[in-house]
Design a protein with these regions (language model features):
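Short alpha-helical elements
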Residues: 1-243
Length: 243
């Protein structure tokens, strides 16, 4: 595994203890700055399942007390964590954090916004607050949440109302437009989970999970940086990973 000398390769294959999560998260933050993604016009915000164990298995897993059971539209019930990421319009992951799978999107987002507004050296993975709004789905709905996030953290969240909401309904055209904007974060998750194999990880320690996650995010942003150097579309990863 150590025969690859290219930094993208070595980043992906080094064991977590050789690259502590703090260093990897710092590298992610550095790449965001290098890619000039700190002040995007908007960021797409979304959560996704991060399973670590088959929830139907008996007994307690390695991360009992940290991970728990949650629901995913794509996976159904799963055991693990909920991952939240913010992505700029070109695909750069500008920040991320995770919590137990049962954590509500609104609760996870509040921690994310609060940490961006009042940075904590132990949680640098969330990145820096941007100047534009966050584009989210209806899972982040809530008038009280909206006002609190805006007033307390300066986070302006735009999301479609639920279809049975008493608020003014959005047109299908507007919903499709918001969905098209948010597609970029789905593309980023596809890279993390499938291209880079995050869904196949079965960590035994929380620190190991943080390192594995940070390594995938760093590799994702590094591939974007490399494509910039080569004059290629930012999200064209397939042949890069075929070296």
């Amino acid at each position: 595994m150590q025969r690859f000398s290219h930094p993208a390769r070595s980043l992906a294959v080094q064991p977590p203890r050789a690259l502590p999560h703090a260093a990897l998260e710092a590298f992610v933050v550095h790449l965001v700055a290098v890619l000039d993604a700190q002040r995007p016009p908007y960021e797409a915000l979304d959560s996704s399942a991060m399973p670590i164990r088959d929830c139907k298995r008996r007994g307690h897993g390695w991360l009992a007390g940290r991970a728990d059971i949650g629901w995913s539209n794509s996976l159904g019930w799963y055991e693990g964590f909920s991952l939240l990421t913010a992505t700029d319009p070109t695909g750069v992951i500008t920040g991320f954090c995770f919590a137990a799978a049962s954590t509500a999107d609104q609760q996870l987002a509040e921690t994310f916004f609060a940490t961006r507004a009042r940075p904590n050296r132990r949680l640098i993975s969330v990145g820096s607050a941007g100047a534009g709004p966050y584009i989210a789905d209806k899972g982040f709905e809530g008038a009280e949440n909206y006002l609190r996030w805006l007033e307390s953290f300066g986070a302006h969240v735009i999301h479609p109302p639920k279809r049975n909401s008493r608020k003014k309904r959005w047109s299908k055209r507007l919903r499709r437009w918001i969905a098209s904007i948010r597609q970029i974060v789905e593309n980023a998750y596809e890279k993390l989970f499938n291209t880079f194999g995050l869904w196949r990880e079965r960590p035994h320690e929380l620190e190991g999970l943080r390192a594995r996650l940070a390594a995938r995010v760093a590799l994702h942003n590094f591939c974007i940086w490399l494509n910039d150097q080569l004059g290629r579309p930012r999200l064209t990863f397939a042949d890069l990973l075929g070296w």
